[in-house]
Structures are given as structure tokens and as C-alpha cells.
């Protein structure tokens, strides 16, 4: 689990939050349409939550994870949108803010019917739906 990896490297949740580092960013080898490496982030609280089961996958069905599924390492966040599952993981980083990738900042947002002017939408300041709608599923 990612929480075990963070603890192994001496990262303490309470100490990280005191310094304002409340997000765990993941970056992959491929690039998005904006030229920025594909990435995502989750709240650090989720990374440390034992029930969230955030993990780094290197196998799938008992075999090394196939290239098309993220070989050699994939960041997996159960219960959230697929765009948070970063393939070809190159980096995990504690941060003061969410990832700057397009899928984190511009996609998976929900705005009510009261928003009538798309130019007035505060994209970067609005959390993604993963923080509003908790999806439950199980990994065995």
C-alpha cells in the first residue's frame, strides 16, 4: 500500500499537513495534450487511509502488469475516476496543491445548473468529483 511506502520513507501524515503538504501527486511517463506529463493527485488523507487501499501495482492477475496497463508500475486509487490511475509511474510527490495536469485541473468537475457562463467557471479552484461522490468497490 502507498501508505506503507510513505511511512517506510519517514513521511508522517500529521507533520506533512503541518507544512501544508496535503496532496500526493503522481506523475506518469506519457504526456497529455498540454505537453505536461500525465498526472493526478489525491488528498494525502486518502493516501494514508487504510480503508482506501491506494497502491502501486506491478502485477495483474499474478503476472507482471502488461505494458498497456502501466508496466512497470501503476498508481491505483480504488473508488475514484480512472484518470487518477496513473500508468508508467515515474514520480510520487507531496505537494501544497493538486497536480497541474489537465485531467486533474480541467476534467471531472461538476457545476450546478446555476452556472450559465462557462467563462466564469473557477476550474482550478473547484475540487474534482472524486471528493464529492465516494465510490465504493472492493479489491480482492
Q: Locations of the language-model features?
A:
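Long, well-ordered hydrophobic secondary-structure segments characteristic of membrane-embedded
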Residues: 1-7
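Extended, aromatic/histidine-rich regions of cofactor-dependent oxidoreductases associated
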Residues: 7-140
Amino acid at each position: 500500500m502507498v501508505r506503507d511506502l510513505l511511512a517506510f520513507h519517514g513521511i508522517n501524515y500529521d507533520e506533512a499537513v503541518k507544512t501544508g503538504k496535503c496532496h500526493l501527486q503522481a506523475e506518469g511517463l506519457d504526456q497529455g495534450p498540454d505537453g505536461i506529463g500525465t498526472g493526478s493527485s489525491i488528498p494525502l488523507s486518502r493516501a494514508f487511509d487504510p480503508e482506501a487501499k491506494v497502491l502501486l501495482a506491478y502485477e495483474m492477475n499474478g503476472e507482471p502488469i502488461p505494458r498497456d496497463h502501466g508496466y512497470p508500475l501503476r498508481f491505483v486509487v480504488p473508488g475514484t475516476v480512472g484518470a487518477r490511475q496513473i500508468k508508467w509511474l515515474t514520480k510520487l510527490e507531496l505537494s501544497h496543491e493538486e497536480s497541474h495536469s489537465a485531467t486533474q485541473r480541467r476534467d471531472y468537475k461538476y457545476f450546478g445548473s446555476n452556472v450559465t457562463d462557462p467563462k466564469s467557471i473557477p476550474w482550478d479552484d473547484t475540487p474534482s468529483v472524486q471528493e464529492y461522490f465516494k465510490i465504493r468497490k472492493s479489491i480482492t
